[in-house]
Design a protein with these regions (language model features):
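Beta-strand/loop substructures that line and gate deep hydrophobic ligand-binding cavities in soluble
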Residues: 91-142
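Hydrophobic/aromatic beta-strand elements that line small-molecule binding cavities or substrate pockets
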Residues: 20, 52-53, 77-83, 106-113
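Hydrophobic ligand-binding cavity/cleft-lining segments
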Residues: 1-49
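Hydrophobic pocket/interface hotspot
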Residues: 29, 39, 63-65, 81, ...
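Charge-dense, helix-prone N-terminal extensions
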Residues: 2-5, 11-13, 53, 58, ...
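Short amphipathic alpha-helical signal-transduction/dimerization elements
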Residues: 34, 145-153
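A short, structured loop/turn motif at beta-sheet edges
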Residues: 26-27, 58, 82-89, 111-120
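Short beta-edge strand/loop motif at the mouth of beta-sheet-based domains
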Residues: 17-18, 37-74, 156
Length: 156
């Protein structure tokens, strides 16, 4: 079930705020983000693959994800976990390793809340250097959440 997408651009910071309700328990959604083998099944926009994921899921632990677009070269994103609160929340820095001049490190918060037998997923990310970078991430996260939903709901 798709609950909708909300986008927020604060006056001082460019951020994104996305929400989705998935018809599965919160523990299943958290597991999909916490386990590299699961993450590889849905991470990235439609058509992307994640052939390599290094994941040290603890506060201060690092991660590195290789992303492969359908018709392009492999690229990487990496960061550090700032908060690990199973099965409620993950917060981590997010940095492209070969950044565009308009890229900078952002912070992602992936929050999960019970909604009856479903789970409300909230993704917040920011602050972005430009509106164009924020818009790219809104598109990327929207497709990524679509893939997460397809994976999890297909199991039910």
């Amino acid at each position: 079930m798709r609950a909708g997408v909300t986008m927020t651009a604060a006056s001082e910071e460019l951020t994104l705020h996305l929400q989705r309700v998935l018809a599965v328990p919160r523990s299943r959604v958290f597991h999909a983000h916490a386990e590299p083998d699961e993450l590889a099944k849905w991470w990235g926009p439609k058509g992307f693959t994640s052939p390599s994921i290094e994941y040290d899921l603890r506060v201060g632990g690092r991660y590195r994800i290789a992303m492969q677009p359908p018709d392009g070269d492999l690229f990487y994103l990496s960061g550090e976990f700032r908060e690990v609160d199973p099965p409620r929340r993950l917060a981590y820095t997010f940095r492209w390793e070969d950044p565009d001049p308009d890229d900078r490190e952002t912070v992602v918060t992936f929050s999960l809340r019970d909604r009856g037998e479903s789970t409300e997923v909230t993704v917040d990310q920011g602050a972005f250097a430009t509106e164009a970078r924020r818009a790219l991430h809104v598109d990327g996260w929207t497709e990524t959440l679509d893939r997460l939903e397809e994976l999890i709901v297909s199991e039910v």
